[in-house]
């Protein structure tokens, strides 16, 4: 007989610095509301993201009826990767009139490769167009 499936009671989506999850907000209150062991999650998340320090890594936490949980790591947000590639702190407040930085098409393709599994694109060219659109909306010029 197949094992019974656990009943899902919640899905939590968070964006946390890699290797730096702690019980303080926003992690603690979000998990505490679902009755999840916060320290257990923090230790597991920090261990899983240790090699990605310096990036914000989104995570999807599935909470089950017995208060156990699974989590799935996503790729860092395209905006954060673009800012890192352009060497900027933040995007433009008025992106269509004031450009704040430049990235090459090669950098855009590299970011698209990184994000490919999370993007809704069939091939790398379509993924690169999505990333280039994000860059334009941040006031970053794509060259090439």
Swiss-Prot record:
UniProt GO cellular component terms: cytosolic large ribosomal subunit
Record's keyword terms, sorted: Methylation, Ribonucleoprotein, Ribosomal protein, RNA-binding, rRNA-binding
Keyword Ribonucleoprotein: yes
GO biological process, one term: translation
GO molecular function: large ribosomal subunit rRNA binding; structural constituent of ribosome
Gene3D superfamilies: Ribosomal protein L11, C-terminal domain, Ribosomal protein L11/L12, N-terminal domain
PROSITE patterns hit by this protein: RIBOSOMAL_L11
Processing after translation: One or more lysine residues are methylated.
Function in brief: Forms part of the ribosomal stalk which helps the ribosome interact with GTP-bound translation factors.
Listed PANTHER family: 60S RIBOSOMAL PROTEIN L12, LARGE RIBOSOMAL SUBUNIT PROTEIN UL11M
Similarity comment: family membership: Belongs to the universal ribosomal protein uL11 family.
Subunit details: Part of the ribosomal stalk of the 50S ribosomal subunit. Interacts with L10 and the large rRNA to form the base of the stalk. L10 forms an elongated spine to which L12 dimers bind in a sequential fashion forming a multimeric L10(L12)X complex.
Name listed for the protein in its UniProt record: Large ribosomal subunit protein uL11
């Amino acid at each position: 007989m197949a094992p019974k499936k656990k009943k899902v009671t919640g899905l939590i989506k968070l964006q946390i610095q890699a290797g730096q999850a702690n019980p303080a907000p926003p992690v603690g209150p979000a998990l505490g509301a679902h009755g999840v062991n916060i320290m257990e999650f923090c230790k597991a998340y920090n261990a899983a993201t240790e090699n990605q320090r310096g990036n914000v890594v989104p995570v999807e936490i599935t909470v089950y009826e017995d208060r156990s949980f699974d989590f799935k790591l996503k790729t860092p947000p395209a905006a954060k990767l673009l800012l890192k590639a352009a060497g900027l702190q933040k995007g433009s407040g008025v992106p269509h009139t004031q450009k704040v930085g430049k990235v090459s098409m090669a950098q855009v393709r590299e970011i698209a490769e990184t994000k490919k599994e999370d993007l809704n694109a069939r091939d790398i060219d379509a993924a690169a167009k999505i990333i280039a659109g994000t860059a334009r909306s941040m006031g970053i010029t794509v060259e090439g």
